[in-house]
């Protein structure tokens, strides 16, 4: 029996389903988290063979001791994963320290966590990347801006989501950023790309081959949602575009991905941009070596009439899957921000789209910055072109 340690199986709240499918496939599923056992969902408790509670997952020594305890009790650990961006480096440290070879090691982290390091691997397979400059001082940044022009995007070179991301449109913006930026954080400055975000989401086997593929489109960037306190909108595509599939598969090979659920983000240019390409071209944004966040795995299920939790667990247990896919549809997510005025009330939305709704819930505070406060997930056979609402209706 294979031993699988799942870090933070209780959060995100839908991740217990990964554990359920691992256990259904005969693995010994061992959880490590900082939530008291008695507060875990009954479904999660039933999906774990054992749970080790630590005071804080931020405390490496505590988590290290938890892994050591499981090894002393169950023997060699075959897998250790969180499927969570926040813990990717922690996962790699634990694998390296305990010689768990089924996933990324500490030495792999730079190319998959640092945005500046990713560019080399995109370029190896002919995928265009934005020009960039590592933030130093005003004069250095201005020299770069003189080449690419305003606006520019500035974000942590190693960052999660859109936190501490800035759009600078003037010298005054640049001066302000240089004053307020965190001194201990390394920032990357990139030329602004006129585009929408298209993703490649896939479950990859040990040979670097996809056993499941889909993708999403984000008409509003996460940066704008977070910085403008806006509503969140994105959707899972009914069928993955061939150019996104091609770029995604090339990226898998270039980055040496094995045995993972991945979420790769690309820009699709909305206008010609001489430094990047023609309108409609797919160019690089960043790689994320984990599933798309929030309720996206459930949305993938709705869009493809399948179960990605099981497909992922099948990849772990068998390196393949027999899980079928049924009828495809578009699956849309709308996250509404509390305190804003909307044309339709909650009750009116539920009445109008009752036949389409798949999930309706409040969003946990930890995710609300990028996703809004009230979420709706619905499926549709067709997709109308999204247009940004007026400020009144946002």
Show which residues each predicted segment covers:
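ATP-binding N-terminal substructure of ATP-dependent carboxylate-amine bond-forming enzymes
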Residues: 1-105, 139
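Well-ordered mid-protein domain cores that form the structural environment of catalytic cofactors
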Residues: 88-97, 107-123
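Active-site nucleotide/adenylate-binding loops and adjacent lid/helix of ATP-dependent enzymes
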Residues: 111-194, 205-209, 234-246, 250
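Short beta-strand-to-loop capping motifs
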Residues: 169, 336-338, 377-383
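ATP-dependent carboxylate/phosphate-activation module, predominantly the ATP-grasp catalytic core
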Residues: 191-257, 261, 268, 272, ...
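A glycine-rich beta-turn/hairpin centered on an aromatic-Pro dipeptide
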Residues: 314-353
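Polybasic (Lys/Arg-rich)
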Residues: 354-385
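Conserved small/polar residues in nucleotide/adenosyl-binding loops
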Residues: 386-393
């Amino acid at each position: 029996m294979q031993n699988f340690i799942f870090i933070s199986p209780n959060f995100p709240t839908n991740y217990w389903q990964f554990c359920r499918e691992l256990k259904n496939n005969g693995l010994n599923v061992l959880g490590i988290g900082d939530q008291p056992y008695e507060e875990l969902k009954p479904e999660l408790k039933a999906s774990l063979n054992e749970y080790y509670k630590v005071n804080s997952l931020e405390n490496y020594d505590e988590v290290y001791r938890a892994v050591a305890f499981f090894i002393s009790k169950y023997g060699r650990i075959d897998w250790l994963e969180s499927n969570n961006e926040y813990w990717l480096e922690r996962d790699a440290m634990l694998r390296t320290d305990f010689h768990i070879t089924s996933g990324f090691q500490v030495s792999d982290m730079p190319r998959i966590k640092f945005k500046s390091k990713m560019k080399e691997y995109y370029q190896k397979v002919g995928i265009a990347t934005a020009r960039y400059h590592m933030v130093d001082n005003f004069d250095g940044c201005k020299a770069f801006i003189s080449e690419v022009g305003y606006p520019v995007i500035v974000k942590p070179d190693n960052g999660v989501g859109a936190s501490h991301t800035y759009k600078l449109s003037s010298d005054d913006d640049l001066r302000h950023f240089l004053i307020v930026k965190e001194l201990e954080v390394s920032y990357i400055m990139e030329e602004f790309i006129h585009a929408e975000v298209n993703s490649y989401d896939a479950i990859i086997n040990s040979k670097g081959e996809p056993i499941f593929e889909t993708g999403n489109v984000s008409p509003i960037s996460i940066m704008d949602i977070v910085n403008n306190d806006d509503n969140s909108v994105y959707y899972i595509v009914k069928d993955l575009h061939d150019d996104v599939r091609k770029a995604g598969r090339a990226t898998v090979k270039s980055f040496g991905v094995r045995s993972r659920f991945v979420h790769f983000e690309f820009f699709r240019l909305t206008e010609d941009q001489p430094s990047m390409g023609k309108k409609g071209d797919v160019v690089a944004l960043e790689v994320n070596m984990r599933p798309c966040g929030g309720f996206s795995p459930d949305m993938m299920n709705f869009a493809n009439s399948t179960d990605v939790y099981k497909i992922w667990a099948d990849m772990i247990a068998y390196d393949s899957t027999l899980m079928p896919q049924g009828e495809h549809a578009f699956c849309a997510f709308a996250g509404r921000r509390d305190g804003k005025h909307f044309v339709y009330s909650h009750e009116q939305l539920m009445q109008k789209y009752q036949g389409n709704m798949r999930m309706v819930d409040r969003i946990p505070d930890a995710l609300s910055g990028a996703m809004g406060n009230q979420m709706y997930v619905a499926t549709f056979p067709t997709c109308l072109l999204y247009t940004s609402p007026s400020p009144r209706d946002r």
